[in-house]
């Protein structure tokens, strides 16, 4: 028994950081050998992925599904698969390095208004990076869905670190916006904001919209300080004008997908794309987001070392909002209260209950936080007292950087690796409002337990709630609907678009459970 305690003690007290763990490792482009007998039958996920890629160039695209102990129960619709293949062909015809793209950018540079809507089949929407990695991923998925619905080409601003994190998602072309794109220089000189003269919301407020004179581009402003006029871009009447504009430039930090369902034209297509409404991000993320080989090496090595032998895996993601941030006892108490109340972790016993007839189960807890104290304290709790179930509890935290360092390559790579590791757990607890958490549980097809935001530095009661949907929350949606639904609470227009559990009076979320 003493030997067992010593071994467990030695395992639990080590919290490995990615920087120390992986700097000692050489990137192995082949990863571990996988026996043919262990390969899943459907590495293309029901046709969600195309086979038109070289596997070695991006190991995670197909190999990441070997790590799942069971396949996702959510399969893409045939219509979604068909639309993705159609989009890939359109992107190949209109993407960077094509004649169509060159002609479109030349027209954009001339900055001439159009008298008609005839601009060919190639129209574009440019995504500008903003805020942390979680925000960037949920907005990329949102903008890509909008591109599918409107038959536009998504181009991604790569002045940040997108290409260091993610592989190209479309075969035979690129989604990266060329650095000589004429409007990029403008962003450095002035910046895109509500005061930008071709901001759609500003043009509406200034009565500057003329249906017979089409601007060469519009800027869509959809961040936390957006006005109601900015949020009208998804409405049917507004889309009839916006659809004629060849170039859209969008800056957003929000998952605006729920609002797209409020447009009847979009809704007709969305219902066919996603019969299971809570699967939007789950499918789009598995299609779009494939970590680079460097990031995937981090994921596979950490998983093999610490998670692969567990009987059960629990992910806990802790984000402390506001100032000061850091380790707080009331947050630690909240995590323990939630996990024990929901039977995710066992209670503590004063004396050990050893069942010699069968070996104890191993439950591994993966903690993602900027602060190491949460995993250290959780470790110490189970070292000090045995679990009521007799399970062995091991706690691991891949990194603890204390400060968010957005746009630092190594920091963002670790963050992406941890999102994927969390998505590979069996159950997950995440902080409410956290886009890092949204990406992790939705990517894994998991319905999370959401930790309520503490008020006045006290532990909430109840500490958490089980979400009925695995979709992210749209934090700053329009407060009302469009046209006929103007003035109606946007969370009460459709039975499947309702307020979020972690933002009861503001956010919107998609649900299948009516």
From Swiss-Prot:
Sites carrying sugar chains: 185, 210, 355, 377, 456
Chief localisation class: Golgi
TM region positions: none
Biological role: May be involved in cell wall biosynthesis. May act as a fucosyltransferase.
Organism placement in taxonomy: Eukaryota, Viridiplantae, Streptophyta, Embryophyta, Tracheophyta
Tissue: Expressed in root, leaves, stems and seedlings.
EC number of this enzyme: 2.4.1.-
Localisation per UniProt entry: Golgi apparatus
Organism of origin: Arabidopsis thaliana
Official protein name in the record: Putative fucosyltransferase 10
